[in-house]
Regions:
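Generic recognition of short, well-ordered alpha-helical interface segments
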Residues: 231, 243, 277-281
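A solvent-exposed, acidic/Ser-Thr-rich amphipathic alpha-helical stretch
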Residues: 254-299
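A general secondary-structure junction signal
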Residues: 94, 260-263, 302-305
Length: 388
């Protein structure tokens, strides 16, 4: 389907002027925001943005630049995602989205708000969470596009259909199917999809959908929710500094899940191969990680628009970013902890740590602790009375 340089439901253009560099520059944040939500990859999103803006720059008389760049970006991203899904199926370990850190990250466009002409029902910074992007990975490319266009960006189904290249009925079905897929991964009582609404609910006008439930994004939605999330992260940071299992236990939900993404690119022992579940197991693993004497520290940051932590190497091993931790909060406790330490997913955030140097420091710390324990054991044995 050929893109029209208008809004998805606009009229045919006439020959005339092209958008200048300044106008294209203003479109870049919106294009990136759409591409990143479609792909969960900064590098892939940047490639899509470059291609989309090139196509837009070659189209005369673009009457609705925001809608047009959204259309072009989405169509390119659908094709990219189809091939990316094959690669992700062969990924080593758990695949997690590339984190965005801000404000003040090296990608300030990630926090930019779009024109209200397109994103009239959403803030682009309001659906960046790792938990939300992980849920989107359960969708097919066209389901993901239909859901984002309608439920996040506020496109009518008719315009979303034009973007995707299908009928309005099919676009509506894609978005509905996306909600049902996502609903399987959140508490059933939190979600009532269009096809599964309670019988006592008031009837909807014909053709009207339920908005996407807040539960689908797993984000703090009120000031008190945000304050609770910030408090939990502060207490988690204190637990990391203390290193005691009990300090973590009081913060974790019973069914908490800890997931790590090293992509097979980090030294053995610095990442987990598959997610770990359960309050006690996760607490012990966290205490073990922070208690190894590694030359690293944690810094508060917004990760995916939510309170999170950066894992940073100390200057003694050259400094640099090791990874990020993002958190999912449910009922006032941490229900999900996701760490990304694959260096190929962190390069956009600045200087990275030298993992080989960090691993060597970890080995030295382990050897020192082992030697200290042996020395203490010998001293204890020497002090014990001997039998005559």
């Amino acid at each position: 389907m050929t893109e029209s340089p208008t809004s998805p439901s606009g009229t045919a253009p006439t020959a005339g002027a092209f958008l200048d560099d300044a106008a294209l520059g203003r479109l870049r944040p919106l294009s990136f925001a759409v591409a990143y939500r479609m792909l969960g990859s900064v590098a892939e999103a940047e490639d899509v943005v470059q291609e989309a803006l090139t196509r837009v720059s070659q189209s005369p008389d673009v009457r609705n630049p925001d809608a047009f760049v959204t259309t072009v970006t989405t169509r390119i991203a659908i094709d990219v995602l189809r091939s990316a899904r094959v690669r992700r199926e062969q990924y080593v370990g758990e695949w997690l989205p590339e984190p965005l850190v801000g404000p003040g990250s090296s990608l300030p466009v990630a926090m930019a708000a779009p024109s209200p002409d397109v994103a009239r029902h959403a803030e682009l910074a309001d659906d960046l969470s790792t938990a939300f992007l992980v849920l989107l990975e359960t969708l097919t490319p066209t389901e993901r596009a239909a859901f984002l266009l309608h439920d996040v960006l506020g496109f009518p189904h008719s315009e979303a259909a034009d973007v995707i290249g299908t009928s309005e009925v099919a676009a509506r079905q894609l978005a509905s199917r996306a909600r049902r897929r996502i609903a399987r991964h959140v508490a059933p009582q939190q979600v009532a999809t269009q096809d599964e609404a309670p019988q006592h609910a008031a009837p909807r006008p014909p053709g009207q959908d339920d908005p996407a439930p807040d539960a689908l994004t797993s984000r703090p939605r009120t000031a008190s929710d945000r304050a609770r999330a910030e408090e939990l992260v502060s207490r988690f940071l204190a637990a990391c500094e203390e290193g005691a299992v009990d300090s973590f236990l009081e913060l974790l939900a019973e069914d908490v899940v800890l997931a790590g993404d090293g992509g097979g690119k980090v030294p053995l022992g610095m990442s987990i191969a598959r997610p770990v579940a359960g309050r006690v197991t996760v607490a012990r693993m966290l205490a073990s990680f922070v208690g190894r004497g590694a030359p690293l520290h944690f810094e508060r940051a917004l990760v995916g628009g939510e309170p999170g932590l950066l894992i940073v190497a100390d200057d003694v091993v050259g400094g640099g970013l090791i990874g990020t931790w993002s958190f999912e909060v449910s009922d006032g406790l941490l229900a999900g902890i996701r760490g990304v330490i694959n260096p190929e997913k962190l390069g956009h955030l600045g200087q990275l740590a030298d993992l080989d140097r960090l691993q060597a420091a970890l080995r030295s710390a382990l050897e020192a602790r082992t030697a200290a324990r042996r020395t203490a054991a010998r001293q204890t044995a020497d002090q014990e009375p001997t039998e005559n």
